[in-house]
Amino acid sequence: ADHDEPEFSYLSWAGMLFAAGISITLFFFCVSEPLTHLVQPPQGEALNADAARQAMQVLFLHWGLHGWGVFAFVGMALAYFAYRHNLPLALRSALYPLIGKRINGPIGYAVDGFGIIATVFGLGADMGFGVLHLNSGLDYLFGIAHTQWIQVGLITLMMGAAILVAVAGVDKGVRVMSDINMLLACALLLFVLFAGPTQHLLNTLIQNIGDYLGALPSKSFDVYAYDKPSDWLGGWTVFYWAWWIAWSPFVGLFIARISRGRTIREFVFGVLLIPLGFTLAWMSIFGNSAIDQVLNHGMVALGQSAIDDPSMS
C-alpha cells in the first residue's frame, strides 16, 4: 500500500538482498572462473593481457546485470500483485492478468510446483559447489580428505544451520545472519584489496567496469558463431543463465517479502545496483589478484589448478 513503512532498515535490507542473490558460488567462482578463462579463453591466445581482459569481461557478463535483472523482474512482479492487489505472495499471482482467479486452481498450483522444482535444482547446484569448496579448504588446512561421509556431514551441517535460521524467522534469523554475512564479506574483501597490489586492483576494477559496460550489448548476443565449434558457451554462459533462472522463483519471492514499503525506485536501485556493485567489486578484486599472480609472479600452475580442481582455487 501507499503508506506502508519499510519493515527493515536500508542497511539490513541491502544485506538481505546480497545474501539472497549470492551464495557460496561467489567464493567458488571468483578465482576459478577468471583463471579458467585466462588459461582457456573462448577467443584468442591464452595467458596474456588480452586474455586477462577478456576473462574479466566474461566474468562480469555472467555475474552482472542479466542475472540481477531476472531477480528484479520476478521480485517486482510478485511484490506488485501481493501488496497492491492483496494476492498470495506466490509465483501464481504473477499470472493474474492472464488467467484471473484461475490462479487459485490447477494452473496456478502447477506454476508454484514448477517454481519449487526449479529452486530445488538451483539449491542442489549451490550445495554441491559449497560442499566441494569447504571440503577442499578442510583438506588444505587440516588434512581432512575428500570422502563421501565428510561431504554428507557438511551437507547436514549446512542444512541444519539453514533450518535454524528459517525457524528463527526473517527478523531474528535471516536479517541477523545477512548482516553478519555482509560484514564478514566486506572485511575479507578489504583485506584482499589492501594486502595485495592495491593500486593495480583499483585500476583493474575501473577498467573492468568500463570494458563490461562498453561490450555489454555485443556480448549479450555473442554466440561465437564465427569461431571454431566448442562446448564453451554451453558450459559457461548457458549454464549461468539457467542457474539465474532456476533461482529466480525463490529469490524473487524472498525479495518481494522483505521489500514491502519500498518504492519502485528504491526497489530497482536496491535490487539492481547495490548487490551488483558489490558483486562486481568482489569478482574484480579476487579475480585480478589471482590473474596478477599468474601473469606477473610466474604462478602458471595456479591457473591450471583452476581447471583441474576449481574448488581449491
Model-derived features: positions:
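Hydrophobic alpha-helical transmembrane segments
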Residues: R53-M76, Q151-L157, V223-S248, S311-S313
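Selective recognition of specific alpha-helical transmembrane segments in multi-pass small-molecule
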Residues: M16-T25, A72, G115-G124, V152-V167, ...
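N-terminal alpha-helical transmembrane segments of multi-pass membrane transport
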Residues: A1-A51, V167, L190
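Transmembrane helix-loop boundary segments of multi-pass membrane transporters
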Residues: E5-E7, L134-Q151, G169-L183, N203-D211, ...
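Helix-loop-helix module between adjacent transmembrane segments
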Residues: I22-L26, L61-L132, Y140-L164, A195-T198
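Hydrophobic alpha-helical segments and their helix-loop junctions in multi-pass secondary transporters
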Residues: F29-E33, G124-L141, G153, C186-V223, ...
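Membrane-interface interhelical connector segments
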Residues: G214-S230, G287-S313
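Membrane-water interface regions at transmembrane-helix termini and the short interhelical loops
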Residues: A1-E7, A55-H62, A77-L87, S136-L141, ...
